[in-house]
Amino acid sequence: MPHDQKALVLDFGGVVTRTLFETHALTEMALGLAAGTLTWRGPFDPPSDPLWQAMQRDEITERDYWRIRTREVADLTGRPFTEMADFVKAARGADPDAVMRPEALAAIDAARHASCKLAILSNELDLFYGSEFREQLAFLKDFDVIVDATYTRILKPDPRAYQHCLDKLGLPAANCVFVDDQLRNIRGAEAAGLRSVHFDVLTPRQSYDDALRLLGLPLLTQGDMT
């Protein structure tokens, strides 16, 4: 393998997909809820979401946060959502492509055409989204590596999670750029030697531009995302 081979390593939820916070209107429509029923906004309005704030203080895990939200939506709809994947499948399963970030797809395409390797490093890809959702996403076939803690049981920011991904890529950490929306995971990646971008869900294009810049690639244009 060329010594200058590079890789783009992405978290999935929130980074490749739009967050559930951004798609409340779609969720409400899909689940038959009145518009405005879902009011939790996470990073888009932290003061109004105490549960999100508790997660940011490490008082609960991200899985805990979504487990609680899933139960709340189950109660609202009367549906038996026992797992996060049940909720996501009902809310998004009809059209998974509609919740993909166009910036993500453009950056993935740019990295692929520049012969960069592609990897997903997720704590909960199939746990939260379900394998059926994943299998509908054609662009994932372009990925060289998918590491999902649903199966490995090793959650970021555990150093072993990053090393497992690097081992599967066959690359040193310095050759990889990692993108994640959780600061704890960014700190873990940096401790493992990866160059990292803390993804900002408020400015997704800027975050992907930062990642492409670290890879030495051209920045996104508006035409890339159409």
Functional labels for PLM-detected ranges:
Residues 52-88:
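A metal-dependent, Asp-based hydrolase signature
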Residues 31-44, 74-90, 217-225:
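Short, surface-exposed acidic
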Residues 1-10, 121, 125-226:
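Asp-based, Mg2+/Mn2+-dependent phosphohydrolase catalytic module
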Residues 24-27, 65-70, 88-92, 128-132:
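Hydrophobic alpha-helical core bundles mediating ligand binding, dimerization, or RNAP-core interactions
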Residues 50-54, 128-130:
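A short acidic, helix-capping loop that chelates divalent metal ions and anchors anionic groups
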Residues 4, 78-119, 159:
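Short, acidic loop-to-helix structural element flanking the phosphoryl-transfer center
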Residues 22-26, 50, 64, 68, ...:
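Alpha-helical elements of Rossmann-like donor-binding domains used by nucleotide-donor carbohydrate transfer enzymes
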Residues 1-47, 191, 203-206:
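Active-site neighborhood of HAD-like aspartate-dependent phosphohydrolases
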